[in-house]
A protein has these predicted regions:
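Active-site/ligand-binding-proximal alpha/beta "capping" segment
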Residues: 162-205, 209-215
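RNA substrate-binding interface of SAM-dependent RNA methyltransferases
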Residues: 72-164
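Mobile, glycine- and charge-enriched loop segments
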Residues: 40, 64, 70, 74-81, ...
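N-terminal positively charged helical leader segments and presequences
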Residues: 1-70
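Short, ordered loop/turn segments at secondary-structure junctions
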Residues: 11, 68, 111-114, 218-219
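Structured adenosyl-cofactor binding patch, chiefly the S-adenosyl-L-methionine
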Residues: 200-242
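Generic structural signal for residues in well-ordered beta-strands
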Residues: 40, 140-144, 213
């Protein structure tokens, strides 16, 4: 049976820990109805260990930490998502699904046609933690503060490849796929525009920076759909070429 996972801080020398977080205690006691002796998984963003519930008290739970679990699910490809800020629910969906498919860093960007200019960091961090627990990944993606499109271009210069998703660009094809997987790439940037699309100036700047210009489909995707499709498609192709 698959063990339930929880994101909790612990150090390499810890043999036990006390869970005092009210929400986690409630989840273990009243939602999952776990009992003394049941095993769970604990991860801290770097390592994962098995844990055994030793005692469930009224407001806290004592866990005995056991052996480390070797997790081979994490991709070796460092994928960074540069996504224009979207309306609240749509951007939350992007953050959740990007976490689930293994994105390492998320950069909310302000582009010319962006209509949303801020987000609730605390809410997003909660979404990231829960998506990491569910998807069985160990590391949590880094959610950066909002940056401008120009700042995103500078940040993306560290990547071996940057993919710019745009409806006016060539359709992703088998030829492009073969060209892509023939390269040894371990860092990838994926750029997703706002609801109103990229401006002509932004498209030209992406071309000037030698971005791979791609239309994902002949169908017109919403921005949040494009983000999920793109990060999975390109990270999957490159990971399979590893």
């Amino acid at each position: 049976m698959r063990l339930h996972r929880f994101f909790l801080p612990f150090s390499a020398t810890d043999n036990s820990l006390i869970i005092a977080d009210e929400k986690i205690v409630n989840q273990i006691k009243n939602v999952l109805r776990l009992k003394d002796g049941d095993e769970i998984l604990i991860f801290n963003g770097e390592k994962e260990r098995k844990g055994k519930i030793e005692e469930i008290a009224k407001n806290a739970i004592r866990i005995i930490l056991k052996e480390e679990v070797i997790n081979l699910r994490e991709s070796k490809i460092k994928v960074k998502l540069f996504c224009s800020l979207l309306k609240k629910d749509n951007f939350e969906l992007v953050v959740q699904k990007a976490t689930e498919v293994g994105v390492k860093e998320i950069y909310p960007i302000i582009s010319k046609r962006t209509v949303k200019f801020d987000f609730k960091k605390e809410r997003m961090d909660k979404i990231i933690k829960e998506a990491s627990e569910q998807s069985m990944r160990i590391s949590l993606p880094i959610l950066h503060q909002t940056i401008s499109f120009q700042e995103a271009l500078k940040e993306s210069s560290q990547n071996q490849l940057n993919v710019f998703c745009d409806l006016s660009s060539p359709l992703f094809s088998e030829t492009l796929k073969e060209k892509l997987i023939s390269k040894k790439i371990d860092s990838l940037g994926v750029f997703i525009g706002p609801e109103g699309g990229w401006s002509e100036e932004e498209i030209h700047l992406a071309k000037d920076n030698n971005f791979l210009m791609v239309k994902l489909s002949d169908l017109v995707f919403r921005s949040e759909t494009a983000a999920i499709v793109a990060v999975y498609l390109f990270s999957h192709l490159l990971a399979n070429n590893d």
